[in-house]
Amino acid sequence: MSSYGSVLFLFSLLVWGTIAQEAPASAAQRCFCQVTGYLDDCTCDVETIDRFNNHGLFPKLQQLVASDYFRYYKVNLKKSCPFWEDNSHCGVRDCAVNPCSSDEVPGFKPPGFKYTEEANHVHEDVDDCEKEKRLSAVDESLSVETQEAMLKWNRHDDSSDNFCEVDDEESPDAEYVDLLKNPERFTGYKGADTWRIWNSIYEENCFKPKAVQRPLNPLTSSRGENEGNMFYNWLDGLCVEKRAFYRLISGLHASINIHLCATYLLKDTWMDKIWGHNVAEFQKRFDATLTHGEGPKRLRNLYFIYLIELRAISKVLPFFERSNFLLYTGNETKDKETKKILLDVLQDARDFPLHFDENSLFSGDKKEAAKLKEDFRQHFRNISKIMDCVGCFKCRLWGKLQTQGLGTALKILFSEKQIENLSESNQPSAFHLTRQEIVALFNAFGRISTSVQELENFRKLLEKV
């Protein structure tokens, strides 16, 4: 080729390269541009997690959490906020209840009435009232058989130290909730109240000094593009434990947002409600252009919390595979079937090839590591308390469950020696999980697993935009 031809060829490559670089990214690329490759502080990549979860673990988890043992969660949704005085609840129609008269609603009867046969067969009398219920209302009705079984379940529980604030199950305000009747989805709960909740979580409990502003924080004045640079320079300079704490909270936040976008109220009439994927809402929360580059980082943190909870589940297998451990609901046949599914899930988790190495946490000077671990635990306990400040009852339900689930995962990760010393005998051991912790752990991981699976759905939908 002549020198002139060579110059022309190189010039053509340069022009086409420039055009390619300037071509606008697609909607899918803007959301998922960083959702690939290896994760920070881990030896695992996004693609391995996608294959493992979406084509293997996800359907088994869904079957598990739909079983009787895992679908009922006892929770107190009436506790007051311990950090600020705020008696307000979600005021949007779909997030608030228009009260019925006292003779129509079981909730206004004496405390024991709601568990009677009469209380659970009032649907014909309150049809008009039911139409006024908001999306965030928690359906607390239980069948007669379930009510009777609940009385027996608690005998199999103990208590233990943990990473989150636990509701007093003996409180008259603590009630069993059927999670299948109360799915986590869009409720219309948004605005200043939600910002205040998440601001308290990030600003006061993520080891962050006041001088460093979190990007896109609506409750603080913006410092422009440099705001993000300052924050991530600070984050990169933290020890791995503090960095992990922030990424866990960010991953949980991302997961919750994905659920709301995936089961969004697309149509609402008095006759019908249609739920489905809201692509525009997903873009608003995760598109790199619309979030100044923050959205894809949040999605990467979703995979980080997935690895943490997956590692915890893999490590707790010895606790559940003991022959004397029962998933007790009173139905022996179903209980055995549920335990079989559970052990299958746990074995799959153990077989995952690229687990997070929890030994990288709290591994320095013993005295400093012990203090850092306690700070870690206290910060997380504060976050679990903040969930009592959420004004939407359905959001509060799932917030409390998911923080307890993550707290239980952390408890497992830092109880390795106690788990190794478990025995088949009925003697008390240093490690134990209550029924509430077990239900929260697997439902919380089920939510994270669902989020990872939903990303595949959103990726396909965005490719059509």
Swiss-Prot record:
Any one Gene Ontology biological process term?
A: protein folding in endoplasmic reticulum
| Enzyme Commission number, as recorded | 1.8.4.-
Give the record's membrane topology.
Peripheral membrane protein
Q: List the disulfide bonds.
A: 31-44, 33-42, 81-389, 90-95, 90-129, 95-100, 206-239, 392-395
Q: Which residues bind FAD?
A: 185, 187, 198, 250, 253, 285, 298
Q: What class of enzyme is it?
A: oxidoreductase
Q: Which UniProt keywords apply?
A: Disulfide bond, Electron transport, Endoplasmic reticulum, FAD, Flavoprotein, Glycoprotein, Membrane, Oxidoreductase, Redox-active center, Signal, Transport
**Notes on how activity is controlled:** Enzyme activity is tightly regulated to prevent the accumulation of reactive oxygen species in the endoplasmic reticulum. Reversibly down-regulated by the formation of disulfide bonds between the active site Cys-90 and Cys-129, and between Cys-95 and Cys-100. Glutathione may be required to regulate its activity in the endoplasmic reticulum.
Which cofactors is this protein said to need? FAD
Residues of the signal peptide: 1-20
> Major place of localization?
endoplasmic reticulum
An example Gene Ontology cellular component term from the record?
endoplasmic reticulum membrane
What does the sequence similarity comment in the record state about its family? Belongs to the EROs family.
Q: What does this protein do?
A: Oxidoreductase involved in disulfide bond formation in the endoplasmic reticulum. Efficiently reoxidizes P4HB/PDI, the enzyme catalyzing protein disulfide formation, in order to allow P4HB to sustain additional rounds of disulfide formation. Following P4HB reoxidation, passes its electrons to molecular oxygen via FAD, leading to the production of reactive oxygen species (ROS) in the cell. Required for the folding of immunoglobulins.
What's this protein's name? ERO1-like protein alpha
This chain's source organism reads Xenopus laevis (African clawed frog)
**What gene does the UniProt entry assign to this protein?**
ero1a
